[in-house]
Each structure stands twice: as structure tokens, then as C-alpha cells.
Amino acid sequence: MAIADNKKARFNYTIEEQFEAGMVLEGWEVKAIRAGQVQLTDGYVVVKDGELFLIGCRINPLRTASTHVHPQADRTKKLLMKKDEIRRLVGKVEQKGYTLVPLNLHYKGGRVKADIALAKGKDLHDKRETEKKRDWEREKGQLMRHKISSPRKDT
């Protein structure tokens, strides 16, 4: 079950490969995520010293958060993956045009995981083409529903 989806990622990028990564979170962040107070749209993944970090993922703290903890909504979160997977990602990201973007957050075995994708940015004409295809699929579905639901007139 997805907690939060980054719908803009699929529109702005061409997804090449998907990976699953664990996240290092604080207690107040887990509570806020369970309450649905998370936003991924501005998030991106960077590589520093052979480690992956999720930047721009906004987790809004709950009002009931403890007073001795000072929550930061835009805190950088470390992502956990196997070393060989990270090395492979670093090699791909160093190629021109590739980037790492978060696709969604979900639960797996009671833990919060992030799906990240190796992606290439789309050009403006690619975005327009995607929009045209989506509109055509929607229109086609409406036509088929209308055709099936209306009775046939034979005279």
C-alpha cells in the first residue's frame, strides 16, 4: 500500500529502472507518515560519499509531537541500500542526463520504504505527447462506456 506517490516524477521523467530503499527516520517522522503528512513532489536523491540521501521530501510534524524534540520538516533523510546497488546507481547517475527521483513511499514488513527510480528528464514535446496519449485514453474509455451503455436502435 502506497503512503505517498510522486505523480510528477512519471510525467517529468522517463523511468529507466526502479529500486527499493530503506529510510532512516526519527520517531516523530514515522508518526507523521502514518498520519499521511508527507509530500514527495519536490524530492530528489543525491549521492554523497557513496551514500544516498533523499532531499526535499517534506514531512510535516504532528501538533502532538514531543516538546523536547525540534522537528524539521525538510530534514535530509539517508536511504539504505546494498553497496553493490549503490555503486551501480552511482555509475549510471554520472552518465549525462540520468538522475534519481523518489516515486513513492510504502510499508514493507512494518517499515517505511522508498521506491526510487533511475530516470532521464523528458523534453517539452515528450511531455505534450504523454498528455495527448492520456487524453486519448480517457476519451476512448468514455466513448466505449457510452457505446456499451446506450441501447441499440434497429429500425
From Swiss-Prot:
It is found in: Cytoplasm. GO terms for molecular function: RNA binding. Residues 123-155 are annotated as: Disordered. Keywords: Cytoplasm, RNA-binding. Residues 143-155 have a biased composition (Basic residues). GO terms for biological process: trans-translation. It holds the Pfam family SmpB. HAMAP family: SmpB. Belongs to the SmpB family. This is SsrA-binding protein. The lineage of its organism: Bacteria, Pseudomonadati, Pseudomonadota, Betaproteobacteria, Burkholderiales.
